[in-house]
Design a protein with these regions (language model features):
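Hydrophobic alpha-helical segments, chiefly the membrane-spanning helices
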Residues: 1-325
Length: 325
């Protein structure tokens, strides 16, 4: 999960440095992480479930997923409650001290993973062969990979900002909203491709725990480490429209959790997740074209999400009752 989040790290830190030097809002950095987390939950798990139903262990609901929910809520509180900038505007921000707390959070999370791994060290995977590699060769690969990620991240940030500027100028649209749209969609989907490939391959091999674990770990890493590092470098200010995107991220987290409670995301569930993303994408386009949040569009989107969550919950309870009978 940490490895597949490297593109998000490169893009968000790159945008943070760009804002530090040139000024402006970090719409790409914040949009990248929020959008990537939404993509992981709705697109990655959605496509994985369409290929092969995802069976979810009970331990995921009791341990890993509650951590993801807690981290997501903390991120929302930091951004929306404590993140108003000093200029008295409606701009939200992740401040430097908040970033440091998030970094401490990822350290604690890694320590928890190490402790959990030692606790379960008696459980091993059979039939797996690990290809040996010399230390020198490993170092070379790490250096080349790091250089590639950094260079790629800078290129993505530069390209995203230019795309946003070009679209905004040509169509006379709000620059911040266009930049947010690019960050939440094009950049987010692009940086989520490693998670998508990893999860689909794992699902096709029947390794469902890897598919879901990859998404959970990646989303936790995105918030605690990527946002933590990026905001520690430079506070991440972002337009006030981010509250809607964060709410969608929280709703997506809850929706997947409802599936997890009943231990399975089947093909129909996969289509529900993918449909949820399409609804969000339509809203983003409406918001960008109109230049502001539209009340009716917000109401329709949140109403549809509520219906989906209720449907999944009722459907899960019905299937659970049938199994008992």
């Amino acid at each position: 999960a940490f490895g597949t989040s490297c593109p998000e790290l490169a893009v968000s830190v790159g945008d943070s440095i760009s804002c530090l030097i040139e000024g402006g809002n970090a719409n790409v950095a914040m949009g990248n992480i929020v959008g990537s987390n939404i993509c992981n939950l709705l697109i990655v798990l959605g496509f994985s479930a369409v290929f092969t139903p995802i069976v979810i262990k009970k331990s995921v609901c009791k341990k890993e997923y509650p951590i993801l929910i807690g981290v997501s809520v903390l991120f929302a509180i930091f951004t929306l409650c404590f993140g108003l900038n000093n200029e008295g505007t409606n701009t939200y921000a992740i401040l430097r001290w908040e970033g440091i707390i998030l970094i401490i959070g990822i350290i604690l999370y890694v320590l928890y993973l190490v402790w959990s791994n030692k606790k379960n060290k008696g459980i091993t995977s059979e039939g797996e062969e690990i290809e040996e590699m010399s230390i020198l060769k490993s170092i070379v690969f790490v250096i080349l990979g790091a250089v590639g990620i950094v260079a790629g991240g800078e290129a993505v940030v530069y390209g995203a900002k230019n795309i946003a500027y070009g679209i905004g100028s040509a169509a006379n649209l709000n620059h911040d909203l266009v930049e947010a749209l690019v960050g939440l969609t094009i950049v987010a989907v692009g940086t989520s491709l490693p998670e998508l490939v990893t999860s689909i391959v794992a699902a096709k091999k029947g390794q469902n725990d890897i598919a879901l674990g990859n998404v959970i770990g990646s989303n936790i890493f995105n918030i605690l480490f990527v946002i933590g590092i990026a905001s520690a470098v430079n506070p991440l200010t972002v337009g006030n429209q981010i509250w809607v995107d964060i709410m969608v991220m929280l709703i997506a987290t809850v929706l997947v959790f409802v599936f997890a409670i009943f231990g399975r995301i089947n093909k129909a569930g996969g289509f529900i997740l993918l449909t949820s993303y399409v609804i969000y994408l339509v809203y983003l386009i409406i918001r960008t074209v109109s230049g502001k949040d539209i009340a009716w569009a917000l109401s329709v989107m949140f109403a549809l999400y509520a219906i989906m969550i209720i449907y999944v919950l009722i459907n899960g309870l019905i299937h659970k009752q049938k199994k008992k009978e």
